[in-house]
């Protein structure tokens, strides 16, 4: 449960200590500049419509790993302007439960929470996922399907919190922690891309809020380096 609280620090977001950006540090610096801008103009006290207009206007475009990218307060998107055709090892690097995992790992669950139910729901779903995978590996398809279906209500509850934290009418409203989640989520994926660029021959095909699609040479060395 949550108890609606006014924190008054929507734009006082911070960067997580795990970030080790070098080549693309300037993207993090752009977010830092936006924080300064918002605080200096007192955006916290603007009405809902004006804040929404400001948020939508904040986009930073740059090229990352040869692919045009757009960063903002809602997420990141990177894709080539032209179709890409590749054969070989195309990997979809999907971050499982990205936002829920980040909220728990870095203490960013809404500060309006009155209990630890979010972590309980997270752990319950994780246990079900483990059973689903085990059943699938053992060839028990019906059981695996059953466990997958059982997870759905928990998955919806977990994913609902990120949106609720930006909804003024919701008791879970905590826009600062939502900003921390969205911004650091983008920067951690950017950090991953920066580290993957050292793999000889690797190509980034697409990136989005919670995952990447990459192409790597069909060699054991390339796969082991990525792994």
PLM feature spans:
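Conserved "right-hand" nucleotidyltransferase catalytic core of DNA-directed polymerases
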Residues: 1-90, 95-101, 191-197, 202-227
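Helical catalytic core of nucleic-acid polymerases
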Residues: 52-192, 198-199, 215
């Amino acid at each position: 449960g949550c108890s609606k609280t006014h924190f008054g620090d929507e734009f006082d977001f911070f960067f997580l200590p795990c970030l080790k950006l070098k080549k693309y540090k300037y993207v993090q610096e752009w977010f830092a500049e936006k924080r300064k801008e918002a605080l200096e103009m007192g955006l916290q006290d603007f009405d809902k419509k004006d804040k929404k207009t400001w948020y939508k206007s904040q986009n930073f475009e740059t090229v990352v790993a040869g692919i045009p990218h757009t960063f903002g307060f809602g997420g990141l998107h990177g894709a080539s302007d032209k179709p890409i055709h590749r054969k070989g090892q195309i990997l979809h690097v999907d971050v499982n439960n990205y936002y829920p995992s980040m909220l728990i790992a870095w203490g960013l669950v809404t500060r309006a929470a009155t209990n630890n139910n979010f972590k309980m729901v997270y752990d319950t779903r994780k246990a079900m996922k483990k059973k689903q995978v085990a059943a699938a590996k053992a060839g028990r398809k019906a059981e695996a399907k059953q466990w997958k279906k059982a997870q759905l209500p928990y998955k919806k509850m977990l994913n609902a919190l990120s949106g609720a934290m930006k909804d003024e009418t919701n008791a879970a409203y905590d826009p600062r922690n939502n900003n921390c989640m969205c911004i650091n989520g983008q920067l951690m994926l950017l950090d991953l891309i920066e580290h993957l660029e050292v793999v000889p021959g690797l190509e980034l095909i697409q990136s989005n809020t919670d995952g990447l699609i990459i192409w790597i040479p069909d060699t054991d060395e390339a796969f082991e380096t990525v792994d």
